[in-house]
């Protein structure tokens, strides 16, 4: 029986990206199944009454330094995104509504664009590039996430 790991993520979380890259390395032989569970990190911060590191200068500096250390130590390609933080609501909704067979690619491309290529994934033109890369129907995607563009 294959064990599974629930992986809670938000595309805007550098720690989600770094943890996912480490999990991929640990699971290169498919010893366990990763069950992806999208969350809204900003919502968790609000629920807990926590000021997100993005809005506190000291926390932000520490987080950037910490992420660089983690990436370097684990040989993970990582670039801090100049647009951090963004509103990831539509992309996270998108992950929930796209075809099950496309989720893994969508997941990878969103993380890759944001945390490796420094691309603003909240920008509609870039979202369309992501959708094209993943062969996801743009009209259906925007309709399904409640953002009829």
Residue ranges and their predicted role:
Residues 2-6, 15-32, 100-105, 109-149:
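C-terminal cap of thioredoxin/glutaredoxin-like
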Residues 10:
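Residues immediately within or flanking Cys/His clusters that coordinate Zn2+
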Residues 17-117:
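Structural alpha/beta surface segment adjacent to cysteine/selenocysteine redox centers
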